[in-house]
C-alpha cells in the first residue's frame, strides 16, 4: 500500500523446512485504541536504521492523527530515540503489535524520536492486502472541518480537500 508503506509477503508453507517453521511465531496484532501516555513500548525491527535492533521507551501521546491520501490515521509519539531511517513495529509488554513505526511525523525538535501508526487503524489495510485485494484509491487528502475550525475561519463545516493527486479518479471527476 503506497499510503502506509505496508507490504504483505507470503511464502508457500510447503517451501519452508521444518527447522525454519519451528522458529516462526505469529505476531499478534493488539488493540491500540486503549493506549495512553506513559504506556511502555518496545520498538523492534530496525528502529536504529539497522536490522535486528530493539529500543524501549514510552508512548508520549496518542492524541495525534495524520492525513494521507485517502486515509487519516491515529499515530503515537514516543520518547524512543531512533533513526530517521528507522522502521519496524511497536510492541506492548504483552508482546502484541500496537503500531508500525513510520517516519516524517515527529515534531520539529524531535526528528529522531519514533512515531507509529496505530495498528487498530491498519488492521483493515493488512486484511485487504493479505487477501490480495486492492486498496481503494480516490486520490484525495482531506481534513475534517469541525464547528470550531468553521467558526474561526468562516468556512462551512464538513470536509476540506487539502490535496488532489495528479491523474487520480478525484482529479478526473473534477474535484479541487
For each predicted feature, which ranges?
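Catalytic nucleophile loop of clan PA
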Residues: 82-100
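Terminal peptide-recognition signature
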Residues: 9, 38, 43, 59, ...
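Flexible, gly/ser-rich surface segments that form the specificity/activation loops bordering the active-site cleft
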Residues: 27, 31, 37-71, 106-109, ...
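Conserved active-site neighborhood of the chymotrypsin/trypsin-like protease fold
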Residues: 1-45, 49-52, 80, 84, ...
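PDZ/PDZ-like domain micro-motif
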Residues: 85-88, 146-151, 165-176
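C-terminal cap/linker of serine protease catalytic domains
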Residues: 97-156
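Gly/Ser-enriched beta-turn/beta-hairpin loop segments
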Residues: 2-4, 15-21, 62-76, 128-135, ...
Amino acid at each position: 500500500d503506497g499510503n502506509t508503506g505496508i507490504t504483505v509477503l507470503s511464502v508457500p508453507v510447503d517451501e519452508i523446512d521444518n527447522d525454519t517453521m519451528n522458529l516462526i511465531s505469529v505476531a499478534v496484532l493488539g488493540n491500540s485504541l486503549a493506549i495512553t501516555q506513559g504506556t511502555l513500548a518496545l520498538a523492534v525491527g530496525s528502529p536504529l536504521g539497522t536490522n535486528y535492533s530493539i529500543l524501549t521507551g514510552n508512548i508520549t501521546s496518542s492524541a495525534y492523527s495524520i492525513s494521507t491520501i485517502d486515509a487519516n490515521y491515529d499515530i503515537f509519539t514516543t520518547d524512543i530515540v531512533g533513526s530517521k531511517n528507522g522502521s519496524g513495529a511497536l510492541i506492548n509488554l504483552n508482546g502484541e503489535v500496537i503500531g508500525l513505526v513510520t517516519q516524517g511525523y515527529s515534531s520539529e525538535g524531535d526528528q529522531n524520536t519514533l512515531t507509529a501508526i496505530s495498528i487498530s487503524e491498519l488492521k483493515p489495510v493488512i486484511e485487504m492486502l493479505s487477501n490480495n485485494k486492492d486498496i481503494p484509491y480516490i486520490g484525495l487528502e482531506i481534513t475534517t472541518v469541525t464547528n470550531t475550525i468553521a467558526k474561526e475561519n468562516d468556512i462551512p463545516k464538513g470536509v476540506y480537500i487539502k490535496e488532489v493527486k495528479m491523474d487520480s479518479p478525484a482529479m478526473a471527476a473534477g474535484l479541487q
